[in-house]
Every structure is written in C-alpha cells, then in structure tokens.
Amino acid sequence: MKKYADFSSFKNKHIGQRCFIILTGPSLTIDDINLLKNEITFSVNSCIRLFDKTSWRPTYYLISDPLVYKSIGNELEKSDLNCPFFYSRNGIKKKINLSNALPYKALYFYHFLNFITNGKTTLGWSLDINKGIADAPSCVYAVMQIAHYMGFKEAYVIGADCNYSGPIQHSNIASYQPKVKIPKNAGNHVLKAWRSIKIHLENKNMKVYNATRGGMLELFPRVRLEEIVKEDQKWKL
C-alpha cells in the first residue's frame, strides 16, 4: 500500500471557482461560519470543535502539525467529518485509519532554509501536490497550495488574525489551547508564510482576499464577508 495518496483527481477540480479558508483566530464567529454553508470551504485543525455549534461542515479539511494532532487526534477520528481530509503523513508520523484521510508528503527543505537564513529566502511552493506539499510555519500554506492545484480563481480567508501579541491567539469557539507555549516571535514566522503565499501567487491565476474581521494581516485586499456572500447570492437570483 502506498504511503501517500494519489491527488490526480483533484487537479483543476474547481477551475475558475472560489473557496473560503476558515482559520482559527479569535475573530472567528459561528455567525460568519453559518454564512458559508453553501460555499466551498477549507477548514483546519480545531475547526472540528465547531461541529456541535453549527450544521456547517467543511468541503475539505487539513491538519499538518503533529502537536495539534496530539491534542485533537482522538476527537478528530471520532468526529462526523466526512469530507476529504488532507494530513501530513511524514509530519504527523502515523497513518490515520479513516476512509476519507489523504496522506501527503510534506517538503521541509525550503522551510529549513528559510529558518536558518532568518527569513531571507522564500518558502517553497508545490505545483504538483502528488510530489509533495511545501511546508511552512502555518497550515494555511499547505491549504493554499492545494487550492491552487484544484484551480480555484479566488480564495477568501477568515479567522486569520495574525496577532500574537495579546493573551488570546486562538478562537474561543474552536476551544483549542496549545499544549506548548507559543514563542513570542511566532507571529513573525507565520507572516513569513503569508509573504511567501503572496510572492508565489503574484503571477498565477488565483487571487487571495482577507475577509477576517480585524487582525493584523494586511498583505492582501480586505473585503467584508457578508458583502461577498450577498453579492454572489444576488447574482444567482
């Protein structure tokens, strides 16, 4: 049996469409999530802890951090998550025995190079996720590579607060408290991932928009979530 999944069926599956990427910053609300019930959504990490608060379920889910998996793995495997579920097989270092689990190979070289040069190099990027997905200090980096591989034209991000200076750094509704202390420079490392996303997608056919309420991520055009959803609904009438 192969260690990694074959992702060929996902190539350009959503060509020209839009997606919403739900992250777990403190600005995330159930009201915002409920706006996205009819949208294509990616969610990550402790988003599974929202399932008892909403009928929304993601279209795709991803987890890449072994520490996060250690914290929520049992809940994840018992949850009613039934969408394609991407996970870093060599990062988490175990096979997840779920029928919808899709192990991918995380590529660490450029992440390591970026770290030892103190951010002076750009993080890697994979155009073919069958060959691996470039790793970064944030799981959103893997999500963006998958979304690009799938052919999405637009990606809207919510819950991307990128504020690591305050006492609250994760969503209360997602109920995730890291078991390890987050270093003070964590925000700088996460911003490296966002900067590399901007660089890699600059001349590609996928635009990123920030629909987060507040926060400190200013690398992408800001939009109001309800207006984006409302505009699309109006167009469909």
Task: Give the label of every model feature segment.
Residues M1-L237:
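Metal-ion/cofactor- or nucleotide/acyl-coenzyme-handling active-site neighborhoods
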